[in-house]
Amino acid sequence: LGDFVEPSKEIVQEIKDAYEARDAKAIGAAGHKLKSSSRSVGANALSDLCATLEKTGKAEDWDGIDDALPHLEPTLGLILEYIEGL
């Protein structure tokens, strides 16, 4: 789980940077990376959210991105709190 924490924070920052740059394809690519690692540690809610970002990013669906993105950091935060408590 320790190998998940820092990379996940970095990928979330990539997604935020891509959002600021209005680069939907980069959001999709970063969402794909975090989706896979989230699923591998059992963080299914985060993985599902990242799957949405991957799909909407690849489709350049800004409405979908705008709906999903605000949930990213709070969801990751809950997972990181849980991991730190182990």
Where are these regions (language model features)?
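Long, amphipathic alpha-helical coiled-coil segments characteristic
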Residues: 1-33, 37-40, 59, 63-86
